[in-house]
Amino acid sequence: MRRSLRLQGKKNFSRVYKEGSVVRSDYVVVYFLPASEQRVAVVVSKRFGNAVRRNRIRRLLLEAWQENHDHLPSGYYIILPRSSLLSVEENVWRSKVKELFHEWQWASGKNSPHCSAVL
């Protein structure tokens, strides 16, 4: 992923958590704050295993986001996997995450400044 698409900095993370909206699914939680540019961060805690496993989850979630980000509203995204993600096969949760982005895209519209859908 290009460096310019990464969400970085404690200040930006705090703003997204405090002022942003939340969309929850069975396997991920996505925080969103409308902004003029599109940036993303995937936060995977240590409870998901060693660094190799966490980085794999991070890469797969980023891949799902990259496949759909052109159709999502501009803003800051923080993607957090839920622990239920570990209890199912990879293809199941990947399809559910992609489905979440498609439903979010449909609910918000491409140029919508804010998404209020809760899935």
UniProtKB/Swiss-Prot annotation:
InterPro entries: Ribosomal_Su5_D2-typ_SF, Ribsml_uS5_D2-typ_fold_subgr, RNase_P. GO terms for cellular component: ribonuclease P complex. It is an enzyme of class 3 (hydrolase). The keyword Transport does not apply. NCBIfam families: rnpA. RNaseP catalyzes the removal of the 5'-leader sequence from pre-tRNA to produce the mature 5'-terminus. It can also cleave other RNA substrates such as 4.5S RNA. The protein component plays an auxiliary but essential role in vivo by binding to the 5'-leader sequence and broadening the substrate specificity of the ribozyme. This is Ribonuclease P protein component. The lineage of its organism: Bacteria, Pseudomonadati, Coprothermobacterota, Coprothermobacteria, Coprothermobacterales.
